[in-house]
Amino acid sequence: MRISVRATIPPLIKGIYPSLRPLILGHQQLQQRIHFFRESLRNLRSTGSIAPSSRFLCRAIVRKIDPHKAKVVVELGPGNGVVTRYILRRIGPSARLYIFEINDVFIEKIRATFNDPRMTIIHDSAENMGNHFREIGIEEVDYFVSGIPFVMLPELLTEQITNQCLSWLRVGGRFVQFHYSPLLLGLYRRVFGNLKLEVVALNIPPAIVISCEKLSPANQSLISHS
């Protein structure tokens, strides 16, 4: 049974609840950050960060999503679901969000946090996305949003996953990735043929949002030969 914070407050202090609410919410956010920090230390290779994404980073990421074109959105490595919340706010009521996550703790956290019929959680690695897409009946993806720490993974695996993203994207669709270093910019440019960058300083640590569009074969050929 879900008990609201308001219902647990004695009647004598209900009148000052509005002034207490920021403190209560601040405590909840602190607990979430501590939870993320502990889990990240245990699984730093798969999480890639010791702090959840700031609201400034989340907003920069979802600005790359056109809600009118976002019918199928795939999130890779959502962590504890901070970016997930912003994606669900951004996309329309008929859109679908598919999430790939391998960490059991984060999956349970996301399931407990969100009750949204548009969202499907897939407990598997992103490298196996093709099998799941074919099973579900997905023909193409409009947007990939990735928080996978590719800089900590073997380059061959990174290329395999990003090439799969490219093959499943519709022409004009986007792959959106955030990182904390520019080490893999050359790889994304090589795979997608283009990229745009946005630096988000108000994050711990400062982050880079990378956006790559799937070009038409003709445009891709022009870039390859330029």
What is the predicted role of each segment?
Residues 200-226:
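Core SAM-dependent methyltransferase catalytic element
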Residues 70-79:
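Conserved class I S-adenosyl-L-methionine
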Residues 159-171:
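A short glycine-rich, Lys/Arg-flanked "PGG" loop and its adjoining helix->strand segment in the class I
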Residues 29-67:
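Class I SAM-dependent methyltransferase Rossmann-like catalytic core
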Residues 80-93:
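Conserved SAM-binding loop of SAM-dependent methyltransferases across substrates and taxa
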Residues 96-101:
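Conserved SAM-binding motif I beta-strand of class I
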Residues 171-179:
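Conserved beta-strand signature within the Rossmann-like core of class I S-adenosyl-L-methionine
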Residues 106-136:
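S-adenosyl-L-methionine
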